[in-house]
C-alpha cells in the first residue's frame, strides 16, 4: 500500500539495529531523529545503555558525547532518505525536559515551547549549512 501510494518507509534514528542505520535506508523513505512521542536525542543518549552508546560513537566516528547529538542529525541529513525531519529540540541539543509527550501519561505533556531567543544566528547558520551541504534546502 505504501509503495502504491508513493509513500516510503519511515526510519527513526534512535536505536542500533542494522536495518535502521543510514547506510541501509531506501531513497523512498523518511528519516527523523524524533517525534512528539519519544525523548529528545540528547535525552535518549543520556538514557542509552553504554554498549549501544559505544556502538553509536564508533559508527558515527566520534568519542565525544557532546558532539553525538549533532552527528546523529548529520547522519539523518546525509542519508539517501528523500525526507529528513529534525525536531528543534534536537538542533537545540535539549535533554528530556524538552520532551513534548510521554504516551499514556497525564501531567506535563504538550507543555514545551521553544524560547523565542533559542535560535541564535550562529545556530541558524549551522543548521542552514548542514541542510545546504546535504541538499535539504
Model-derived features with residue positions:
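Hydrophobic faces of well-ordered beta-strands that scaffold small-molecule active sites
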Residues: 9, 31-32, 84-86
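Conserved, mostly hydrophobic/aromatic
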Residues: 36, 110
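C-terminal/domain-terminus segments
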Residues: 95-109
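A glycine-rich beta-turn/hairpin centered on an aromatic-Pro dipeptide
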Residues: 57-86, 92
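Single conserved hydrophobic/aromatic residue that forms the stacking wall/gate
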Residues: 1-11
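Mg2+-dependent phosphoryl-transfer active-site scaffold
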Residues: 13-22, 26, 42
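Short, solvent-exposed loop/turn segments at secondary-structure junctions
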Residues: 12-14, 37-39, 82, 90-93, ...
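Polar, glycine-rich mid-to-C-terminal structural blocks
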Residues: 42, 47-59
Amino acid at each position: 500500500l505504501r509503495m502504491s501510494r508513493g509513500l516510503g518507509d519511515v526510519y527513526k534514528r534512535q536505536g542500533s539495529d542494522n536495518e535502521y542505520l543510514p547506510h541501509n535506508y531506501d531513497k523512498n523513505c523518511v528519516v527523523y531523529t524524533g517525534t512528539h512521542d519519544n525523548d529528545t536525542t540528547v535525552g535518549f543518549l543520556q538514557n542509552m545503555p553504554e554498549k549501544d552508546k559505544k556502538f553509536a560513537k564508533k559508527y558515527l566516528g566520534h568519542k565525544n558525547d557532546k558532539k553525538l547529538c549533532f552527528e546523529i542529525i548529520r547522519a539523518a541529513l546525509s542519508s539517501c532518505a528523500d525526507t529528513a525531519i529534525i525536531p528543534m529540540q534536537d538542533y537545540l541539543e535539549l535533554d528530556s525536559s524538552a520532551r513534548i509527550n510521554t504516551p499514556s501519561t497525564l501531567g506535563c505533556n504538550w507543555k514545551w515551547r521553544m524560547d523565542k531567543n533559542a535560535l541564535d544566528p550562529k545556530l541558524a547558520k549551522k543548521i542552514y549549512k548542514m541542510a545546504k551541504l546535504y541538499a535539504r534546502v
